[in-house]
Swiss-Prot record:
Localisation per UniProt entry: Cell inner membrane
Matches recorded under HAMAP family: Thr_Ser_transp_TdcC
Transmembrane segments: 24-44, 45-65, 95-115, 140-160, 163-183, 207-227, 259-279, 319-339, 363-383, 385-405, 423-443
UniProt KW keywords: Amino-acid transport, Cell inner membrane, Cell membrane, Membrane, Symport, Transmembrane, Transmembrane helix, Transport
Record field: catalytic activity: L-threonine(in) + H(+)(in) = L-threonine(out) + H(+)(out); L-serine(in) + H(+)(in) = L-serine(out) + H(+)(out)
Cellular component, GO annotation: plasma membrane
Membrane topology of this protein: Multi-pass membrane protein
Protein name: Threonine/serine transporter TdcC
Primary location: membrane
Length: 443
């Protein structure tokens, strides 16, 4: 074979889209599509038609540019097997590694609290509205649910990992089917209630504030950052030795782009379908009741009474069950991350970073008691979930997903080539706006 033929063959090999790339597109997509998506329609729809259109425009840039920035940071590690912790240690030293460990834990733990509140409220709503049973004490409900989940997690973690993996795509399929099944119930109320004269840009209910608060929920809902480090390591091991780091970066960007498109299409279609079925007033009630949109839809169809169709009855019960499964799936995944983060903090400070000296079985039990105990307290207090996302969950995700990579671009020589890019300013603004949600929640 001539050298020209070799080059052509090499280029063909480089341009090939592999099955592993498709698997990672679906993997990133599946990681993001969880219980957080069940709150996005409430936040997006509460302001009516115009804010959700603005969010539709922002959805892909937020999902793509923010995750690409984090992937570029992960790609800057010296070795192809370096994960984000190794890379941060290289760039910012031991202190930086400790800070990231703290951020990692406090980015995931509030999400676990959010899901603890959510699964309690969802079960209570199902108990009262679908099963038509008398009200029960939420403290007892939360404790019982957490004890059952703790039992399954402690004694069957490996089995649960497999089960949760199998549930990802059935959940996505159910989400799409529910979006389609709502079409017969679409109304024109959202358009007839639209009044240009009553719109305002500013104020607590203005378009800008609604979109600003919606950005935090978008960062929370369109988030597959926990898997980005593993994704980058996998792609570096697959491509970098043969094709170089620049090509690997381009391949990662393409995979993230396709995953983001898929995610935005599914989530935004679900959000619009809910908005066309319900009304902004319904969304406000869902926020006040502190339940996910599927639970509210179930209650909505339940209220139709004896005149409802079999189709509506299936939607009523199906929506509640899917919501419970989705929240449990997200709770389990975030529990493992919280456990890892808390164990990491205890080992770092209690055992001077020597994992081999830590009694892991005892440590796991202590961490479980702390995690489940704090989750029960929050679930009993029942803070507003959307406010909790805006005040705690989304801002810390934004610090890791948006601001850390942008700081690294400014500080780290290996990332200097990305300085001055327009997307950097966009990612930084999104990160700052999300973090400023804390200020709004305190006002």
């Amino acid at each position: 074979m001539s050298s020209t033929d070799s080059v052509v063959a090499g280029q063909a090999k480089v341009s090939t889209w592999r099955k592993t790339d498709t698997r990672w597109v679906l993997g990133l997509f599946g990681t993001a599509i969880g219980a957080g998506v069940l709150f996005f329609p409430i936040s997006a729809g509460i302001g009516g038609l115009l804010p959700i259109i603005f969010m539709l425009i922002l959805a892909f840039p937020i999902a793509f540019f923010c995750h690409r920035a984090l992937a570029r940071l992960c790609l800057s590690g010296r070795s192809i097997s370096d994960n984000i912790t190794d890379t941060v240690d290289q760039h910012f030293g031991h202190v930086g590694g400790v800070v990231i460990t703290f951020l990692y834990f406090f980015a995931i733990c509030p999400l676990l609290w959010i899901y603890g509140v959510t699964i309690t409220n969802t079960f209570i709503a199902f108990w009262q509205h679908q099963l038509l049973l008398p009200a029960i004490n939420r403290g007892v409900v939360a404790l019982a649910i957490l004890l059952v989940m703790a039992f399954f997690i402690y004694f069957g973690k490996d089995l649960m990992v497999k089960v949760m993996g199998y549930l990802v795509f059935p959940f996505i399929t159910c989400l799409v089917l529910i979006s389609l099944s709502l079409i017969p119930y679409w109304t024109s109320d959202i358009f007839t209630s639209f009044d240009m004269h009553s719109l305002s840009l500013f104020g607590s209910h203005g378009i800008l504030v609604t979109v600003w608060l919606g950005i935090a929920i978008m960062v929370f809902s369109f988030n597959f950052s926990p898997i980005v480090s593993s994704f980058v390591v996998s792609k570096r091991e697959e491509y970098e030795a043969d094709f170089g780091r620049e090509y690997t970066e381009q391949k990662c960007a393409k995979i993230i782009s396709r995953a983001s498109v898929l995610m935005v299409v599914v989530v935004m279609f679900f959000a619009f379908s809910c908005l066309f079925t319900l009304s902004p007033q319904d969304m406000a009630q869902a926020k006040q009741q502190n339940i996910p949109i599927l639970s509210y839809l179930a209650n909505h169809f339940s209220s139709l009474g004896s005149g409802k169709s079999t189709y509506a009855t299936v939607l009523e019960y199906g929506a509640s069950i899917i919501a419970l499964v989705a929240i449990f799936k997200s709770f389990f995944g975030h529990y493992l991350g919280t456990l890892e983060g808390l164990n990491g903090l205890i080992i770092k400070f209690g055992y001077h970073g020597e994992k081999s000296q830590a009694p892991m079985k005892k440590l796991n039990m202590i961490s479980m008691v702390i995690i489940m105990g704090s989750t029960w307290v929050i679930a009993y207090i029942n803070p507003n979930i959307l406010d909790l996302i805006g005040a705690m969950g989304a801002p810390i995700i934004a610090a890791l997903l948006c601001l850390l990579p942008m700081y690294a671009v400014w500080r780290v020589p290996a990332l200097a080539k990305y300085k001055g890019k327009a997307s950097n300013y966009f990612v930084t603004i999104i990160g700052l706006l999300t973090i400023l949600n804390i200020v709004y929640q305190l006002m």
